[in-house]
Amino acid sequence: MERHQPRLHHPAQGSAAGTPYPSSASLRGCRESKMPRRKGPQHPPPPSGPEEPGEKRPKFHLNIRTLTDDMLDKFASIRIPGSKKERPPLPNLKTAFASSDCSAAPLEMMENFPKPLSENELLELFEKMMEDMNLNEDKKAPLREKDFSIKKEMVMQYINTASKTGSLKRSRQISPQEFIHELKMGSADERLVTCLESLRVSLTSNPVSWVESFGHEGLGLLLDILEKLISGKIQEKVVKKNQHKVIQCLKALMNTQYGLERIMSEERSLSLLAKAVDPRHPNMMTDVVKLLSAVCIVGEESILEEVLEALTSAGEEKKIDRFFCIVEGLRHNSVQLQVACMQLINALVTSPDDLDFRLHIRNEFMRCGLKEILPNLKCIKNDGLDIQLKVFDEHKEEDLFELSHRLEDIRAELDEAYDVYNMVWSTVKETRAEGYFISILQHLLLIRNDYFIRQQYFKLIDECVSQIVLHRDGMDPDFTYRKRLDLDLTQFVDICIDQAKLEEFEEKASELYKKFEKEFTDHQETQAELQKKEAKINELQAELQAFKSQFGALPADCNIPLPPSKEGGTGHSALPPPPPLPSGGGVPPPPPPPPPPPLPGMRMPFSGPVPPPPPLGFLGGQNSPPLPILPFGLKPKKEFKPEISMRRLNWLKIRPHEMTENCFWIKVNENKYENVDLLCKLENTFCCQQKERREEEDIEEKKSIKKKIKELKFLDSKIAQNLSIFLSSFRVPYEEIRMMILEVDETRLAESMIQNLIKHLPDQEQLNSLSQFKSEYSNLCEPEQFVVVMSNVKRLRPRLSAILFKLQFEEQVNNIKPDIMAVSTACEEIKKSKSFSKLLELVLLMGNYMNAGSRNAQTFGFNLSSLCKLKDTKSADQKTTLLHFLVEICEEKYPDILNFVDDLEPLDKASKVSVETLEKNLRQMGRQLQQLEKELETFPPPEDLHDKFVTKMSRFVISAKEQYETLSKLHENMEKLYQSIIGYYAIDVKKVSVEDFLTDLNNFRTTFMQAIKENIKKREAEEKEKRVRIAKELAERERLERQQKKKRLLEMKTEGDETGVMDNLLEALQSGAAFRDRRKRTPMPKDVRQSLSPMSQRPVLKVCNHENQKVQLTEGSRSHYNINCNSTRTPVAKELNYNLDTHTSTGRIKAAEKKEACNVESNRKKETELLGSFSKNESVPEVEALLARLRAL
């Protein structure tokens, strides 16, 4: 009683001395002990009756029925033993928070304590007690299962213990609302420092309910203050001190599971922490990187992505690399900062599940300078730093180990460019990726050779490649971290599609343009022809005028109207009428020469009327209509007279009556640009036909003008045109062509030349009748001159046909002979191939077995064309065909049958031979030889000394007959071989031709080879799927283990210990236990690696005990290590749907498959022992294995 007496009387507060208090004085004294810390007016406690010395105190009871939620919170805030250090006083708190109500609740509790508790009320209080003790669900569960009496005793013991240890007697605690009010004041001086320090102590010492009460609103205020301090440009000492204090408060808040979850759920919390990473303030940076490390190891993959996103944003804002500040922290002299930075690096590098991503993060740290710093860090003597460096090196070796196994056990130092190139080349060589890889290297050579620019190019390319190769399942985490090069692959694909369409349209446009050019050229040629016709019309009109002037005009009643003018007689080709003849009559003077064709643009063909003949004097020619007057003072345009025909400019002209007074065309004066050089250049560039330039240009111009008026005498216009084209292409004098034909000069005679001559020359009768025109040679046009020269050659057409046959004979032999040899070789190989015979036997067995009970059962043979139908026979599950099954059987049991693919290789060429065409060409060759022999017999003796036709052709006939006889014999032998094959395989000649027979066999050979490739791909896919499945299972187990480890890190060590969550995480980081635990793997034996390699040759399976193997075969279980004599096949689980494109570590897979590979070796030994027993037992036929497989289909 005496030790409680000082707490019962407070004279300073106006209480009467000796005034007694209720019997629950100890608990009330706890509340009263807080009064001296309160500022402002104080209220004395209510008076109470005196306490008699020696009076027995009533038992402490609590009536829960009357408690509100606030009262329960206050009750749950009772501190258990082991309290933390006291907080410093909070300055300048308002008195509004001081109230006498703080003791009302305990007083009421004490007064109502004797009332009994209901079961629900006590259970509610029990839950509040466990929550206050910061117990997780796993530890709460066994406590909830205890008896009600034990729960009641635990609650009472908890209250009594708290009251005896004085936690109920401490001074009044500052409420969360008071801290929140102070933080809202917005102060940024020493007062804020004191407030934050007091808050840190309160967050550390108060129970979870107090922390939760503050965290609802206080966390946002702390983040607002931190954001304000970071965004401010003031670098004062007090600002950085406040910033550090805020981070310490966040650390204390994160020391509870509630606080840690709230921090990780806040979007801006990680971003602000990343911005607070500043090597210039080592102490603050140490706390920041520790918090980030803890978040990385305790969160899921999404949290890691958010941390990296925060670091990236901070780096972009500072215009530095995102890991620059972390690496700079390693350069600082503070060992604690170096340890914390290595913890964060290990947390970032070891947390991702994907190997590629771990390598990417590690390599980025190395590029930022970590590679140069690591040797210096290893020289520092510090246990904590040594642990972090050891973790970094071990995980680096593990990742390189997994990477090497993924690349088929190729171990190389990836820091050397030559080794990396060889590794990449070995993966793409002889694949479709080879061309793209070479293209990439070629494009790298196009980078501009500049010292500064080249570095930026390679940096940009490296960032692009890193984003592309890390793209997985449409979501690449690095896309979020590298916003500067955020590639929208969907848009890129759309662009590629549009580009493909554009190329297609451009190709069509190019084709249309070519057609347009052809049509345009034809149009220009047509216009040139029209101009020639116009010139001819003008010439005829001039002759008509001369005729009229000589013989008089037509009678007056003979009026032949001319076609009307389309332009009202304003065409520029119209000439003014000449003066009329004298009235006395007589012969008029000759008219002026006809005008030349107009220049392009002066008028279109037929744009004006044909000028009428000048009227005679006695017909009254004075009444011709005058020219129309041009509007707006326009003057007639100058009439140009080019010397040659020009190409036309197809424009739509504007007529004068369509213009206005202010029109541009009224004022133009194009004549100022006229000069002789321009017009000559224009004429030479756009003329319809180029003039041939020779030494004497003037003489040639006269000749060309003279040629234009030459007319065809005897040749048809079409023949003449074709001969003109022929002569213009060869440009050889006519006599020289004649001598080449007479001498049969094969060095100068071309096959195309002879073919054109035969095609375009007139027939022999016309040639014979041209001798009468020899005297008029100079007046003939070029084609007629050429024909006259060639008519001197006797029997020209038979001669040309014989020369053409001689020129083509060697080519015909080279075409016929290989075809005959291909068919003959194919027939021989088909008949003598043992592997092909075995294949037919195997197919016959399978077919008879499958056709059992049908009309096709018990077949003795089948048409070889039926081999092509094997691929049409599907399995029961529609996943394979009989052809693929046959290939698989041959691979497993009869590998020598596969050799028939090489034996029948001549079928590839033979199937392309048309025997009918071959025979036709051979017969035609024989007929041409006979015809040539007859020509030589009846050929007249040569009249010209240069005529060597008979001599050369006689020698050619002898040689050609020998070659023809050889070909005939080869063809006869080919037919005999084919007839032998037809009889050998009982093929109906009437129904199956040689072409069909060879084509069917070649198609079967091609599909058989394709089935081999498809089976290989199928096995690779199955093995890959199995490796992926094993890797996924292993990764899932590791993920669950990591989750359990993270869960254990968040738990308390013992039930009654209140060690913080963040303290446990930091302790795990410091010891290295928090990082990924990837077990060490040893390389597998070479033989096991080969057996598991997807590219290795599949070995032949041994004979199995099929009496016990009656389980239906599935497509996904055809690997050789799944089939053994003592095991049945397990169907592949169809519900598993894995993405085979994911980059799962092959090293992890192979390490997991090592045990299975050992089982494979043991199964092989059992199969070997079983083989011995089968070899002794001859009653088991060898085809039982095949029949068992057939039953499965």
UniProtKB/Swiss-Prot annotation:
Motif (Nuclear localization signal): 36-60
Transmembrane segments: none
Motif range (Nuclear export signal): 1184-1193
Phosphothreonine, modified sites: T68
Bias (Basic residues): 1-10
Keywords: Coiled coil, Cytoplasm, Deafness, Neuropathy, Non-syndromic deafness, Nucleus, Phosphoprotein, Repeat, Ubl conjugation
Transferase keyword on record: no
Domain DAD, residue spans: 1057-1087
Residues covered by the FH2 domain: 636-1034
Protein name: Protein diaphanous homolog 3
